[in-house]
């Protein structure tokens, strides 16, 4: 049986976002689990788009070869969909996708 976790980062607090990204990066590099999925949701997308340290962490995670998922509805709401795509995130409607992961 494989071990899986979805790290869902949804805060507007930089420290909370940093911690979620840090865990996803280190956990993936050190193989804490078989599959670590990183999801950016809500206000975290807005702060990541505006913060070079956090966007750099997203790029570092992407360098592991794993995708970063960003919520399309939230990205559109905050006006950062293009920023998320430029960063390299897969911008998608996450509600049904996330539900499938947890089934």
For the regions a language model picked out, list residue spans one by one.
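Residues at the starts of beta-strands that form the adenosine-phosphate
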Residues: 4, 34-37, 67
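Short, glycine-rich nucleotide/cofactor-binding loops
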Residues: 5-18, 42-49
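Structural beta-sheet core signal
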Residues: 7, 38-40, 70
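Histidine-anchored nucleotide/phosphate-binding helix
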Residues: 17-30
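Small/aliphatic-rich secondary-structure junction motif
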Residues: 29-47
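N-terminal glycine-rich FAD/FM-binding segment characteristic of electron-transfer flavoproteins
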Residues: 49-50, 60, 85-86, 90
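A glycine-rich helix N-cap at a beta->alpha junction
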Residues: 52-81
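C-terminal structural segments of small proteins and small subunits
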Residues: 81-103
């Amino acid at each position: 049986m494989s071990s899986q976790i979805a790290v869902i980062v949804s805060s507007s607090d930089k420290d909370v976002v940093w911690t979620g990204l840090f865990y996803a990066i280190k956990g993936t590099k050190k193989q804490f689990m078989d599959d670590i999925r990183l999801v950016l949701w809500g206000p975290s997308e807005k702060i990541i788009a505006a913060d070079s340290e956090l966007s750099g962490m997203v790029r570092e995670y992407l360098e592991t070869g794993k995708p970063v998922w960003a919520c399309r509805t939230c990205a559109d709401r905050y006006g950062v969909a293009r920023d998320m795509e430029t960063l390299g995130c897969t911008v998608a409607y996450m509600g049904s996708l996330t539900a499938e992961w947890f089934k």
